[in-house]
Amino acid sequence: MEMIITAATVATMFFNSATSESNNYFYNAQMEDGKVETLSVMKNDCNMLTNKLQYRFVYDSQDRLSVKEALLWNERSMRWEPDYRLDYAYAEDGFSVSMRKWNKKKDEYGEVTEKMDYAMVLDNVMAINHYECVKGETMELKSN
C-alpha cells in the first residue's frame, strides 16, 4: 500500500476545517489548478477578523505534498513571517516528514530539528518513528 499526501488530501483537510462551526477561526484558501496553494487562518476577535497563520503548500510532479510552510502574522510589521517548514519525502513503504525552524538572525531555515518516519510494516499496520536533533548534531530516536 503506497502512502502519499496528495493535493486532494490537502483540499479535503481545508474543507473539513472550514466547515467546522466549533471555533472562532476562519479559513481562506487560494487554489491553483485544483490544488490548495495558500491557506490563511484568521481569528474572529470581537467581530473583526485578524490574521493569525498562513500555510503555503508545494506539490511534486505527482501532485503529492512536498513542502508545507507555516508563517505567522506580525502585527507590528503587518507582514507574514516564516515560522517553520515541513519537507515530505516519499518511499515505496511510506514517507517521512522533516521539520526546520526559521532562523531570524540568518534569515533562512535552519537544519532539521525533528523528523517523523511513517512506514507500512504489515497490511493496515504503520510504524512511526519520531527523531529529534540532539545538541544540534545527531538525530536521536525519541519514540516509536
What residues fall within each predicted segment?
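Buried hydrophobic residues that stabilize the cores of well-folded domains
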Residues: 14-144
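Sec-dependent signal peptide recognition
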Residues: 1-9
